[in-house]
């Protein structure tokens, strides 16, 4: 009985230590298919390698938040860092600019990464 209590306490202490670890997210913005003006596509923002799990991700069109956005479930890697995919259907054009804005405790201000249609 006493040994199981000690093990439980050690597990709780090690898990509470995970909250102190902070890793900034890596942000990748890309389209599902090569960009063609006027042709429907999907805009993806893959955010990975972050800890803790609290994060805010927005897809932007010309600096304004896109409302109809879907995302994957929050998942974690073997190193206990987290990852997410946010995506939306869009139709690229020469005049529009798309980006992904991420807010996380590791950033003093939100970080915005622009979509490069040539990638």
Curated annotation (Swiss-Prot):
Disulfide bonds join 45-100. InterPro entries: B2Microglobulin, Ig-like_dom, Ig-like_dom_sf, Ig-like_fold, Ig/MHC_CS, Ig_C1-set, MHC/Immunoglobulin. CDD domains: IgC1_beta2m. GO terms for biological process: amyloid fibril formation; antigen processing and presentation of endogenous peptide antigen via MHC class I; antigen processing and presentation of exogenous protein antigen via MHC class Ib, TAP-dependent; cellular response to iron(III) ion; cellular response to nicotine; intracellular iron ion homeostasis; iron ion transport; learning or memory. GO terms for cellular component: cytosol; external side of plasma membrane; extracellular region; Golgi apparatus; HFE-transferrin receptor complex; MHC class I peptide loading complex; MHC class I protein complex. Residues 25-114 form the Ig-like C1-type domain. It is found in: Secreted. The keyword Disulfide bond applies. Residues 1-20 form the signal peptide. It comes from the Eukaryota. One of its GO terms (molecular function) is structural molecule activity. PANTHER family: BETA-2-MICROGLOBULIN, MHC CLASS II-RELATED. Belongs to the beta-2-microglobulin family. Component of the class I major histocompatibility complex (MHC). Involved in the presentation of peptide antigens to the immune system. This is Beta-2-microglobulin. It comes from Callithrix jacchus (White-tufted-ear marmoset).
């Amino acid at each position: 009985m006493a040994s199981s209590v000690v093990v439980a306490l050690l597990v709780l202490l090690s898990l509470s230590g995970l909250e102190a670890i902070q890793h900034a997210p890596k942000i990748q913005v890309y389209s599902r298919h090569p960009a063609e003006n006027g042709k429907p596509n999907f805009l993806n923002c893959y955010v990975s390698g972050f800890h803790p799990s609290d994060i805010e991700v927005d897809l932007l069109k010309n600096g304004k938040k896109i409302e109809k956005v879907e995302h994957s479930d929050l998942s974690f890697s073997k190193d206990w860092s987290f990852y997410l995919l946010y995506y939306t259907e869009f139709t690229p054009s020469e005049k529009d600019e798309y980006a992904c804005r991420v807010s996380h405790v590791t950033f003093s201000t939100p970080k915005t990464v622009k979509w490069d249609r040539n990638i």
